[in-house]
């Protein structure tokens, strides 16, 4: 009897240890934040939630290498693949409102990124041009298993940036596989150039069709509340080799010599379904200056 009890206790402790090591997985594949609380997100670095319940990614300070970084992730991992032989990535979509505040007549550094990653831990990453996601040592490493859509406000010619205000798609590093200057399309399909650090709110939509292996990225100023019919980036891309079965979604920001602040004001996400609508009429307040504050 004592031997059976000992075996049961050993088995029970093994199960508990296995559960403790396993990442928390959300049973819900859809979420909506029209404002934020600290408990909503896994925050690290300079990322914080302000008194007005905006997500602030950086503190407006500057630094030399490795720079300043801020990371913010949804607290639980999401299932991006069904446990079948095909291992095909599911469809997913996200929508968010952001604003970047830089010094007048000077682009801040370096921008922010929406990311899908196997872990929310980026303690070894560098700020600046690496967005708080990568470092000189691992940039471009296929073992990173990271999908990135970057909103970049500094041109780095050595990273093949097309200009100082662009949107790009990165896989496992910060060398874009596709990028376009920041712009949106009006109702009559007229292309309007934009500036990402305009200090005014901008909407972004990122949509991935798993069966079709199609990625679409669209942006528009808040004054243009409906999603434009024309996308900014539309690319055929298979994310199945990149994404694991369970991944984390979130944002990352990096700055170095140049100063800027980035705010995420609202965010929604959906897996295999329509992304929830944001309440654009009640967005959190944010500081429109680098050194003034509503936090």
Where are the model-predicted features located?
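Polar, low-complexity loop segments and adjacent catalytic/binding residues used for recognizing
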Residues: 2-295
């Amino acid at each position: 009897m004592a031997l059976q009890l000992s075996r049961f206790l050993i088995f029970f402790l093994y199960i508990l240890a296995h559960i403790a090591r396993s990442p928390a997985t959300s049973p819900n594949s859809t979420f909506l934040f029209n404002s934020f609380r600290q408990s909503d997100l896994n925050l690290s670095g300079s990322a914080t939630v302000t008194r007005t319940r905006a997500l602030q990614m950086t503190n407006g300070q500057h630094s030399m290498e490795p720079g300043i970084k801020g990371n913010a992730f949804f607290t639980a991992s999401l299932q991006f693949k069904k446990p079948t032989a095909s291992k095909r990535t599911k469809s997913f979509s996200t929508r968010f409102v952001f604003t970047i505040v830089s010094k007048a007549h000077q682009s801040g550094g370096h921008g922010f990124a929406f990311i899908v990653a196997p872990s929310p831990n980026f303690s070894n990453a560098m700020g600046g041009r690496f967005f708080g996601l990568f470092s000189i040592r691992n940039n471009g490493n296929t073992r990173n298993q990271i999908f990135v859509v970057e909103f970049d406000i500094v041109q780095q010619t050595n990273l093949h940036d097309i200009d100082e205000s662009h949107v790009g798609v990165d896989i496992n590093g910060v060398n874009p596989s596709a990028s376009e200057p920041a712009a949106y399309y009006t109702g009559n399909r007229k292309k309007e150039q934009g500036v990402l650090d305009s200090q005014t709110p901008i909407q972004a939509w990122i949509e991935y069709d798993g069966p079709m292996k199609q990625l679409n990225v669209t942006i528009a100023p808040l004054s243009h509340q409906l999603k434009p019919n024309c996308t900014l980036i539309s690319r055929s891309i298979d994310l199945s080799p990149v994404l694991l079965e369970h991944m984390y979604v979130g944002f990352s920001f990096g700055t170095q010599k140049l100063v800027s602040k980035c705010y995420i004001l609202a965010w929604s996400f959906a897996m295999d379904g329509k992304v929830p609508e944001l309440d654009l009429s009640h967005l959190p307040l944010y500081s429109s200056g680098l050194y003034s504050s509503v936090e």
